[in-house]
Amino acid sequence: MVYRRRRRSSTGTTYGSTRRRRSSGYRRRPGRPRTYRRSRSRSSTGRRSYRTRYY
């Protein structure tokens, strides 16, 4: 079923890509990842945001 996999919501984001990113990035434990990059970016407002990417 292609419709279930590529379900486009009203916001314009695809349901499939959101699930794939969540399972590969957030569910993986930072204990022993294959290769992960953690970038710390500070916006002009002063908010600190951490972004961890797993490969």
Swiss-Prot record:
Residues 18-41 have a biased composition (Basic residues). Residues 5-24 are annotated as: 2 X 6 AA repeats of R-R-R-R-S-S. Transmembrane segments: none annotated. GO terms for molecular function: DNA binding. GO terms for cellular component: host cell cytoplasm; host cell nuclear matrix; viral nucleocapsid. Its main location: virion. Sequence repeats lie at residues 5-10, 19-24. Keywords: DNA-binding, Host cytoplasm, Late protein, Phosphoprotein, Repeat, Transcription, Transcription regulation, Viral nucleoprotein, Virion. Residues 1-55 are annotated as: Disordered. Phosphorylated. It is found in: Virion; Host cytoplasm. It comes from the Viruses. Plays a role in viral DNA packaging and nucleocapsid assembly. Promotes viral gene transcription during the late stage of infection while it is non-essential for the basal level of viral gene transcription. Interacts with protein AC132. This is DNA-binding protein. It comes from Autographa californica nuclear polyhedrosis virus. The gene is P6.9.
